[in-house]
Amino acid sequence: MTQHLERPELLSIAATKALDKLQQAHPELLAQWPTERQNELETVIGLSDFIASSLVCDGQLLLWLSEHLDDKEHAEQYRQQLETKLATTADDVGLMRQLRAFRRQEMVWIAWRDFTNKSTLEQSLAHLSQLAEALIMEAYQWLYNQCCKEWGTPTNSAGEAQPMLVLGMGKLGGGELNFSSDIDLIFTYPENGDTVGGRRSMANAQFFTRLGQRLIKALDQPTYDGFCYRVDMRLRPFGDSGPLVMSYAALEDYYQEQGRDWERYAMIKARVMGRESFTQYQELRQMLRPFVFRRYIDFSAIQALRRMKSMISSEVRRRGLSNNIKLGAGGIREVEFIAQSFQLIRGGREPSLRGRGLLETLAAMKQLALLPEKQIEHLEQGYCFLRKLENLLQAIDDKQTQTLPDKPLDQIRLAFAMGYADWQSLFEAIELHMSAVHLVFDDIIGTDEDDAGCSVSEQYNEMWTMAKDEDVLLNIMAELEAPDSANQVSTILGMKAELSKRTLGPRGREVLTRLMPEVLSRIVPRPDASAVLARVTKLIVRVATRTTYLELLGEHPAALGQLIRLCAASPMVAEQLTQYPILLDELLDPQHLYNPTPLDQYGDELREYLARIPEEDMEQQMEAIRQYKQAQLLRIAAADIAGALPLMAVSDHLTYLAEAIITAVVNQAWLQMAEKYGEPTHLVDRNGKGFGVIGYGKVGGWELGYGSDLDVVFLHDCPADIYTNGKKEIDGRQFYLRLAQRIVHLFSTRTSSGVLYEIDVRLRPSGASGLLVSTVESFDEYQQKEAWTWEHQALVRARMIYGDVPLFDAFSDVRKRILTQPRDTQSLQVDVVSMRHKMRVHLGSKKNGMFGLKQDKGGITDIEFLAQYLVLQHSHTEPYLTRWSDNVRIFDTMAECEVLSLSQASALKQAYCVMRDDIHRLNLLGLPVYVDESQFVTERETVQQIWQEYLVPSSDE
């Protein structure tokens, strides 16, 4: 089409500038360019900065292109050409150079043919996929041979050589790779065994792990020549925390026992790269098929599909993706989702639905009459249009983007390349296709919401319409017999005044006009209307300029109901929703909202949540972890408010959530450090990082509250003479210091989703003046020779919350030895009582007639000090007392060991739990932790009696 359009002025200017640069760089080569293709050259370099810069960098490409642009069978020779080029390559550096040069050459060829309409969409997608497969497989083959020379050939028990199979996932697996794309891979090998023929034998798992690491580096690492592909390995079993390579047997066990819906979804497109080279390919295929395609019509997938639909909508709102042709409403993702949903549901019974290609699947759906032909036509046409647009958009500058451009030059480039006279015409065509796709998407997947909303009384419509007239509002309130009408009217008038200061478009005003009468009808009659209305309207004002959130509440009555319920129950939750309105998405599914993640699944769920974000995009990774935390806090609080979780379970959930986040942050910080410096060499033959995080206080005692800080200490076990193995080599201990600094930074950086946790590291050896991270040996020495009694008290509530087995064992040994050492009773009593007195002076209640639940006599802190004192006093003879770090189980253990009587232990536990429960309730209500002094009298007296019995009182007690 572009050949029939006159080149726009803006494009001509860009073409002239690009041609001038090319003329300056390669005048002699440019002179050899065929004159009949001069106009084509100018057009293409005006359309694509990638092509223009590639030709400037490598003038020989001009000669090569003039000979090969019309070679239709070109892609079939990729592997043969690469094999020839690599035959004389001597080392990994040469390999990387050859791969990058070949990729650039072929990507220019593909982009050129795309911009000049010489290739169909199907041809272009196939060429891109074949090129990636060729680069992967020839790099693999070269590296496999090199690794066999270095370490021997991996074999099974029968002595047969074992290959590593590379599974291409996503669009690569489907043969539909886009122009600038990550490649999602999974590595596997048929059987365990050992290498033979090397200097020393090595387990197959170790051989293939090293091979996989070198393959990723060959493709992914940026060099002077660029890179080939961003390699994403997070779709493998267990994600980042799993082994890089797994045997068939381990792979099968994982998918049978732990495979999840999204992994079935991902595995639909899985394809073995270069499968014709491997006799073991069919075995792998047969093994995976039952996991992906169930033998029966799998309607159980429908609920999972609805959840995925909700995730798509959330993604659009979260990242402002309305102009994203992949993730926006009606985008490429929705077409893929429709096709793959039919594959998941019916693929077990219908072999024709097991194809990897999307257009192939749509054709099968048409043949099986699973959708009306008209709907399938809309999907096919929309998909082809958007995929072509996506490729051209990315080929402008070889950038991975699906967001429509803002720059006029890029807009006119796209319009011209797509065959449209101007940007507006193209944009209207985009909207037409995406609207058609979205209609099909909504029709097929459906929604759990009841579309029929109840009619809102005219009084509430009038209340909102007349919300500038106080007298009218008061009259309506009187007619409705609304409680506390004056305060409610004041809130409504204040909301209107705030909204008048904001720029609301016609759409936003229309949505508010529909939404607010419904909001008022639900809140105004409530006994607690004043407080609830103030909280809900504050949130609505906050999101007023973000129409998608208003629509979410307006179109989902159940979500609005959940919002009101939660805001009524807890000012803390209301404030959280107001600060982070992205959490409104969580209200769409009450079953999900009121059922927190199982304790043992926080880590897996967070890994899955982060898998959608490129590892190198640290800003988005940080944001995603915070969003995940906020969503989980909301779910825990919702279950708490609903009475579905007792206090201990709430703390368990908050603690396990914190541990999962700590693991994710450590992994993120480690990736950043390792990329820059490599890893300390003492880890070469060891799993783990040689790094530990010790949790103290509430996190150490499984007693976190909603707003708790994390008290932590960092440890490592790096020997003194160790260095890292990266290009920028540093001392191993310096590496761990920088790692700890990075972790603290990742936790404390404030993003749009807030701070992750407040981190307190003052409990480390020597406090604020000490090193941020210590070796286990120096930690041990400090605890033995320099630590104060209060630091040993703190150690009672300490446990390792992140770390590998050697460090865990080492820390546990240090903790037990310190806690069980013999102590002089009188000195210990003096130290503990003195410290408690200092705390009470500084932190105790100054309010007459009030009891401070935490710091006043007989309160929580007295109970904690009793537990710590008794552990330190009696662990020398009863080492079992050191087993637990939480107060409840410490008291249980004391009763078992007869350190306390059963009645004393029960009384302390009961007092501790009821006071914690009240602190927790006050936190949810956003209130200080003080109660009338007439409360908890019995509990306080009991605590003080036990204190008097076991601790010698100081003169001020």
Curated annotation (Swiss-Prot):
Q: Which Pfam families match?
A: GlnD_UR_UTase, GlnE
UniProt xrefs under CDD domains: NT_GlnE_GlnD_like
* UniProt entry tagged with the keyword Ion transport: no
Tell me one GO biological process term: regulation of glutamine family amino acid metabolic process
Adenylyl removase: where is this region? 1-449
Question: Could you state one GO cellular component term attached to this entry?
Answer: cytosol
Catalyzes what? [glutamine synthetase]-O(4)-(5'-adenylyl)-L-tyrosine + phosphate = [glutamine synthetase]-L-tyrosine + ADP; [glutamine synthetase]-L-tyrosine + ATP = [glutamine synthetase]-O(4)-(5'-adenylyl)-L-tyrosine + diphosphate
Q: Which GO terms describe its molecular function?
A: [glutamate-ammonia-ligase] adenylyltransferase activity; [glutamine synthetase]-adenylyl-L-tyrosine phosphorylase activity; ATP binding; magnesium ion binding
What InterPro entries does the record point to? GlnE (IPR023057), GlnE_rpt_dom (IPR005190), NT_sf (IPR043519), PII_UdlTrfase/GS_AdlTrfase (IPR013546)
Q: Which cofactor does it need?
A: Mg(2+)
Query: Which Gene3D superfamilies did the record assign?
Result: 1.20.120.1510, Beta Polymerase, domain 2, Glutamine synthase adenylyltransferase GlnE, Nucleotidyltransferases domain 2
Give its E.C. classification number. Answer: 2.7.7.89, 2.7.7.42
The entry's keywords? ATP-binding, Magnesium, Multifunctional enzyme, Nucleotide-binding, Nucleotidyltransferase, Transferase
Which superkingdom, per the lineage?
Answer: Bacteria
Q: Where is this region: Adenylyl transferase?
A: 457-957
- What family does this belong to? Belongs to the GlnE family.
Main function? Involved in the regulation of glutamine synthetase GlnA, a key enzyme in the process to assimilate ammonia. When cellular nitrogen levels are high, the C-terminal adenylyl transferase (AT) inactivates GlnA by covalent transfer of an adenylyl group from ATP to specific tyrosine residue of GlnA, thus reducing its activity. Conversely, when nitrogen levels are low, the N-terminal adenylyl removase (AR) activates GlnA by removing the adenylyl group by phosphorolysis, increasing its activity.
Protein known as: Bifunctional glutamine synthetase adenylyltransferase/adenylyl-removing enzyme
| Record lineage | Bacteria, Pseudomonadati, Pseudomonadota, Gammaproteobacteria, Vibrionales
User: What gene name is listed for this protein?
Assistant: glnE
